[in-house]
């Protein structure tokens, strides 16, 4: 029997985006991935935008994703620690996954130390220079007032409007020229500034949809997890180092 000692990191599944068939295919792929890692995973970090939209009403959650959630429950029941990070598409997670899966919900950053290595973990949205309009919107969307007002809307209307907004937001972002990976990558800028006052071996993010492994200095590396719409990339810490991998590619 394999020893469960590895940390797995993945983000930006965007379950629910595209057609029902494409989202279901992505979900089935994720279930196969979770089956694969179950043998040696100690902890699984799902680092934001797991869903293309998510809102927890008091007694209602979005339909679908039952195979994915069932597999997560299986991992949790087997003693594997689950972490859910809020992303910009699924920031309205509250306590459902804590109650049903025993997961820990992370709203912003998480700092951990494992096997003598220090990690800084964050979905990646709203960090670094620029993007001031999104940072303004994020403050509004995360406010208790905004969440309370949205909860007053019937799910048939509220979820429909939110899904439209999510699709529109993605089209706008895809139409923008992306920055080239390297020193000008905005999360690299954020990491460089952070490392002036703190030390981390690994700074791991999602959000950018770019699988990246960039050396920041002699001891620190920036890892971006990519996404699962096309790349199906993820990272693994085996107790010594972090590596990027691609599932079924």
Protein language model annotation of sequence segments:
Residues 124-186:
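Active-site-proximal loop/helix segment associated with metal-binding centers of metalloenzymes
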Residues 104, 125, 131-137, 183-247:
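Conserved beta-sheet core of the metallophosphoesterase superfamily
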Residues 16-18, 52-55, 85-95, 127-129, ...:
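Active-site environment of divalent metal-dependent phosphoester hydrolases
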Residues 6-14, 118-125, 222-226:
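Active-site-proximal beta-strand elements of phosphoester/diester hydrolases
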Residues 2-6, 10, 15-114:
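Core catalytic region of metal-dependent phosphoesterases/phosphodiesterases
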Residues 85-88, 108, 122, 205-206, ...:
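Short His-Asn-centered micro-motif
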Residues 111, 121, 234-236:
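Conserved hydrophobic/aromatic beta-strand scaffold that supports enzyme active sites
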């Amino acid at each position: 029997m394999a020893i469960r000692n590895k940390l797995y990191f993945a983000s930006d599944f965007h379950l629910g985006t595209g057609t029902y068939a494409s989202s279901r295919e992505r979900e089935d792929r994720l279930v196969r991935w979770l089956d694969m890692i179950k043998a040696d995973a100690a902890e699984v970090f799902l680092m934001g935008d797991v869903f293309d939209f998510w809102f927890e009403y008091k007694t209602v959650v979005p339909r679908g994703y039952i195979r994915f959630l069932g597999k997560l429950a299986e991992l949790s029941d087997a003693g594997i620690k689950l972490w859910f990070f809020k992303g910009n598409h699924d920031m309205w997670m509250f306590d459902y996954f804590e109650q049903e899966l025993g997961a820990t919900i992370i709203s912003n950053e998480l700092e951990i130390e494992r096997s003598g290595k220090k990690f800084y973990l964050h979905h990646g949205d709203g960090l670094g220079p620029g993007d001031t309009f999104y940072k303004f919107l994020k403050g509004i969307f995360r406010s208790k007032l905004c969440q309370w007002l949205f909860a007053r809307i019937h799910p048939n209307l509220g979820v429909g409007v939110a899904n439209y907004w999510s699709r529109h937001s993605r089209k706008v972002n895809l139409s923008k020229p992306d920055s080239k990976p390297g020193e000008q990558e905005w999360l690299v800028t954020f990491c460089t500034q952070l490392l002036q006052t703190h030390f981390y071996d690994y700074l791991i993010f999602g959000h950018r949809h770019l699988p990246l492994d960039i050396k920041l200095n002699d001891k620190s590396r920036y890892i971006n997890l990519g996404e699962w719409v096309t790349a199906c990339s993820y990272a693994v810490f085996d107790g010594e180092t972090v590596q990027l991998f691609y599932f079924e590619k």
